[in-house]
Amino acid sequence: MSEFSYEMLNEFLIKSVIHEFYIPHKNDSKFKLFVKRDDLIHNEFSGNKLRKLKFNLKAYFDNRCYGILTFGGAFSNHLLATASVCNYLNIPCIGIVRGDELDLNSNSILRRCSELGMILSFYSRSNFNQIKKTTGNYFFEGNQYWAVPEGGANTEGVFGCREIVSKSDFDFIIVAQGTATTSSGILLELKEKQKMIVVPVLKGFDSLKEMKTLLGNEFERLKDKLIVLDQFHFGGYAKTNSELIFFVDKFNETNNFQIEPVYTGKVMFALNKWIESVNFKENKKVLFVHTGGLTNL
């Protein structure tokens, strides 16, 4: 396969639909809640993962690279998504994994990446941190690869995420923040009166700094559209407590889509609290972007 065609991926992207949902006692005359179902795109490269890879795949083809190389931790959904989509498109791929004490049998994610054909290379944390943001043409063991930074956090990833909310007419769009790639793409696409609510899932994550790094001068023009709810990380990445687990379980019992406690559960919890804290004179439409995160592995 020598050329990139958007049709290669569109059969998956069109599965993402928008529908209304409910939080008990929160859907009233002031709010209508909707969800963008990017979790339906694919069981392994679902959510924002394929969107962040879309234009990186185009760059791989345009630069006539040998393969794709990317970075991730031991439980990285980004590594899994990259391995899966490269398997689908028959593209050689390498995953640089944080932690030289690991191997491909350390967990089900890494094992599945290997099964899909991804060559895994395990680096010490210090060496990994030095190269995890590498992007663009990158020579590795004698071959030219297109390097995608950890989490897909590059310009190509941002542009792929712009498409999440194109042509939408919602007043507020709320999304999880891990690397700020998805939220940066959405911010670029907002219309004049739209605002975006971001919920960092990492403790101490500097949303404004990370988004400015990705967007450059464009960020200054758009930053007033941004609302940061940075108090709902529950202690940090993948950290939870009984209150969050109870909320997620109750939500999943009463809705026709699932959330989880690492990303989407924290966003939904934050949305619930935010609705309680605001008072608008006019009705508002809110879009919750479901970024996936459920791999069943």
Residue map of PLM features:
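PLP-dependent amino-acid enzyme catalytic core
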Residues: M1-L297
